[in-house]
Amino acid sequence: MAPTAYYVALSGLLFAIGMIGVLTRRTAIMIFLSVELMLNAANLALVAFARAWGDLTAQTAVFIVMTLAAAEVAIGLAIIVAIFRKRETTNVDDLATLKG
């Protein structure tokens, strides 16, 4: 089995990639996917530490977080589709303008 440090390093790399995606991308879909990548990176770190400490409670928490993330994906994509149907764009710069 790989040491915990490898999993934590991979988690940090995935989180950094997700953060770069949030900060540099302009479409709502890519920002949404980057946030999900960051959430999965946090889950990976939590599972790695739980395995190192022999605690099963954290794995249960990760399962609950994954369930909530699935609901978040469904709601988030529905909102993005509704915005696209109304505005015909998912560019967040275009969505920032207030129109009555």
Curated annotation (Swiss-Prot):
Taxonomic placement: Bacteria, Thermotogati, Deinococcota, Deinococci, Deinococcales
Cellular component terms (Gene Ontology): NADH dehydrogenase complex; plasma membrane
Protein name listed in UniProt: NADH-quinone oxidoreductase subunit K
Residue ranges of the TM segments: 3-23, 29-49, 63-83
GO MF terms, alphabetically ordered: NADH:ubiquinone reductase (non-electrogenic) activity; quinone binding
Name of the gene: nuoK
Similarity comment: Belongs to the complex I subunit 4L family.
Membrane topology term: Multi-pass membrane protein
Principal subcellular localisation of the protein: membrane
Signal peptide: none
InterPro entries noted in UniProt: NADH_UbQ_OxRdtase_chain4L/K, NUOK/Mnh_C1-like
Enzymatic reactions: a quinone + NADH + 5 H(+)(in) = a quinol + NAD(+) + 4 H(+)(out)
Superkingdom of origin: Bacteria
Enzyme Commission numbers on file: 7.1.1.-
Quaternary structure note: NDH-1 is composed of 15 different subunits. Subunits NuoA, H, J, K, L, M, N constitute the membrane sector of the complex.
GO BP, one annotated term: ATP synthesis coupled electron transport
Key words, A-Z: Cell membrane, Membrane, NAD, Quinone, Translocase, Transmembrane, Transmembrane helix, Transport
Protein location: Cell membrane
Top-rank EC class of the record's enzyme: translocase
Job of this protein: NDH-1 shuttles electrons from NADH, via FMN and iron-sulfur (Fe-S) centers, to quinones in the respiratory chain. The immediate electron acceptor for the enzyme in this species is believed to be a menaquinone. Couples the redox reaction to proton translocation (for every two electrons transferred, four hydrogen ions are translocated across the cytoplasmic membrane), and thus conserves the redox energy in a proton gradient.
Keyword Aminoacyl-tRNA synthetase (UniProt): no
